[in-house]
Amino acid sequence: ILLKSGNRKAWWFGKVIWNILSVLGFYLVLYLSVTAVSIVTGGFKAAQPEVVAFLLENQKIENAGTELYMYAMAVPVIVSLAIAVTQMMIAVVFQPPMGYIWVCAVIAAGIFIYSPYSLGNYLMLMRTPVLLYGSILNALWAVVLGSLLILVSVVIGSITIEKKDIYS
């Protein structure tokens, strides 16, 4: 495909677009599946108040509603896009296994490191301000961080692809 495009940057941007569309496609299938199951079972219930109250030991759920759906549905998509594009860039700059190691490290860091800079935290609904009183996570920061990571990864990949011998 690189030979047909004749331009390394066009090939790189094509890979980026394909990567982004793939991630969006996976989420679309997920959301459509959840919707179909919800229709069959009699309604969409993202969080049953009684169950959530029990799990959170009767803590008050802050900002339920729109913010819950934002943290549950929109923020993970942005973070997943950032992780996927960065993995692809690392695979081009270094080697493909390094990209997989980076993804595992990001997700594992989200388990052990509670920080607004740790992308893995934004993939866990329990760490968000909706379900965790006093949470340091912020949806806007997640979008900014994810978008910045995508932009930096695209630029670094574009620069690298021009200089690197990718045929060998």
Q: What is each model feature region?
A:
Residues 51-67, 98-168:
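Terminal transmembrane helical anchor/hairpin motif
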Residues 8, 19, 107-110:
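Short, solvent-exposed loop/turn segments at secondary-structure junctions
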Residues 9-10, 89-97, 162-166:
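Membrane-interface helix-boundary motifs at transmembrane edges
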Residues 2-8:
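Short helix-to-coil transition segments within interhelical loops
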Residues 13-93, 127-147:
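Secretory targeting signals
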